[in-house]
């Protein structure tokens, strides 16, 4: 019979093989995700109620530490170095306090964001190099900025007797940030998926010509998604339009979006582009409560023709075995803008209320899906 020490050695040997058995570039990403959830369950079973509570209570400081490291430039310095660096080396490069760097490095090492190769010597790993990317820095700092709304959420819900109809102007964000402005008045930074490969655009655009309106990116920000479609379908295949509020579109240059039309538009107003092949919403509806989402959807439906498709690209929650990220995202939406991360059934119900029906769902990475809706057939 194995001793506890032997069990630990066997467990350690299995863990050391994890990155080989389930690499980040594995062909079937779902296999790696399943393995990750099994590993998380194993960690949970090793926790006592006390250690679980401790990990949960102190978790925000992991994010804050990563945010400080991003702003200081620690990840950048380590990623550029071909040799391990000490806190003094890093502090010298950044012209900052070595004692502070040492404290941050301990936190990063404890949370596997850097590797301590020998005592006091640190090297970059895959996580370190990922934190150099602008979208990852933006994601971290966005979450740091959202923290006031998370902290205010319990008291805000209590003050409203847990009976609320939130929206972006009346939610925990205003309380936590001590402001009357919405969170969305802050700059946004997101990573865009190459969603073109997940949806059959070629079939939808098969008979298009230069005058057809192929793709309307509603609330499309700086047009990254529209450019992905444009890159796959040249101007000769039809027109592509990005719509957003003036304070967003005035940041776009024609050079950054060649052969893409830019249009000022508020989703609450009637949709001016009629009969497009595809109307596209990425990460839009989750920012809004049901009654506001229905208002927007009704405007889209009124502009659609029988051949039009409305594509809703959102992270969808599952009622059975939801991922941690999706449940965190849901509360984040509630706290910051009164929105919701909906399930497939909840999103379908919204569409049906405005005369649309779901005609297909395509899965994309990280819990996200593209839901296609068309006008209900009589």
From Swiss-Prot:
- Its annotated pathway? Secondary metabolite biosynthesis; terpenoid biosynthesis
* Record-level Gene Ontology MF annotations: O-methyltransferase activity; protein dimerization activity
Q: PROSITE patterns, from UniProt? A: SAM_OMT_II
Residues annotated as catalytic: 286
Query: Which residues hold S-adenosyl-L-methionine?
Result: 219-220, 244, 266-267, 282
Write down the InterPro entries for this protein, in alphabetical order. COMT-like, O_MeTrfase_dom, Plant_O-MeTrfase_dimerisation, SAM-dependent_MTases_sf, WH-like_DNA-bd_sf, WH_DNA-bd_sf
Print the keywords alphabetically.
Methyltransferase, S-adenosyl-L-methionine, Transferase
* GO terms classed as biological process: griseofulvin biosynthetic process; methylation; terpenoid biosynthetic process
In biotechnology, this protein is used as follows:
Griseofulvin is a spirocyclic fungal natural product used in treatment of fungal dermatophytes.
Question: What is the documented disruption phenotype for this protein?
Answer: Impairs the production of griseofulvin, but accumulates the intermediates desmethyl-dechlorogriseofulvin, desmethyl- dehydrogriseofulvin A and desmethyl-griseofulvin.
- State the reactions this protein catalyses: desmethyl-dehydrogriseofulvin + S-adenosyl-L-methionine = dehydrogriseofulvin + S-adenosyl-L-homocysteine + H(+)
The record's family statement is: Belongs to the class I-like SAM-binding methyltransferase superfamily. Cation-independent O-methyltransferase family.
Function per UniProt: O-methyltransferase; part of the gene cluster that mediates the biosynthesis of griseofulvin, an important antifungal drug that has been in use for a long time for treating dermatophyte infections. The first step of the pathway is the formation of the heptaketide backbone by gsfA which is initiated by priming with acetyl-CoA, followed by sequential condensations of 6 malonyl-CoA units. The resulting benzophenone can undergo a spontaneous dehydration to form norlichexanthone.
* Protein's recorded name: O-methyltransferase gsfD
- Which species is this record about? Penicillium aethiopicum
Task: Recall the taxonomic lineage recorded for the source organism.
Answer: Eukaryota, Fungi, Dikarya, Ascomycota, Pezizomycotina
